[in-house]
A protein has these predicted regions:
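An acidic/histidine-cluster motif and surrounding catalytic segment
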Residues: 1-126, 136-165
């Protein structure tokens, strides 16, 4: 893939891809917060979700509106850019390890939303990552009950990270 910086970090159970056009935060910045978020998820997830989380890996792609719109159209039949997409996958029985799936974030959408909501880009990027990760763990917001549960956990983790708002 052209214009892509990748880092496979097996010890941290993730693969991080930053499009050069979307490189608004450094790899080190992402690594620091991915570690913190996963640690907080481990602390706050209910027991039935912890089994999904242990020994699990994922891929994170930070890209632009064009690419996320293409993905949104292809997989969700919606021809518009979105802020975050999650693609949950299933357990790999042979490796006794779970690959949770992929999270794709549009840096342009994140920047636009941060500006509109008068929040920092850092806050918005981490909010989108947490939101996408919770989808990989099976959380959703199709009903009010689901939304309350998911957003409560999302906000608790975001608050504990203590990123500039």
């Amino acid at each position: 893939m052209k214009n892509l910086q990748s880092k496979n970090n097996k010890s941290k159970n993730y693969e991080l891809f930053l499009r050069k056009s979307a490189h608004i935060k450094s790899r080190q910045w992402w690594q620091k917060y991915l570690f913190k978020i996963r640690r907080l998820l481990y602390r706050y997830l209910p027991n039935q979700k912890l089994s999904l989380f242990k020994n699990a890996s994922f891929t994170l792609l930070i890209t632009d509106n064009k690419e996320i719109q293409d993905l949104n159209k292809r997989f969700r039949k919606q021809d518009s850019p979105t802020d975050v997409l999650s693609f949950p996958l299933i357990k790999n029985e042979q490796q006794n390890k779970r690959y949770l799936g992929d999270i794709v974030i549009s840096h342009q959408k994140a920047k636009h939303q941060a500006t509109n909501e008068k929040k920092s880009i850092e806050h918005e990027l981490l909010l989108l990552f947490i939101h996408g990760y919770l989808h990989l763990l099976g959380y959703d917001h199709k009903t009010q009950k689901q939304e309350k549960l998911m957003f409560s956990l999302q906000n608790k983790i975001l608050e504990k990270i203590n990123v500039r708002n």
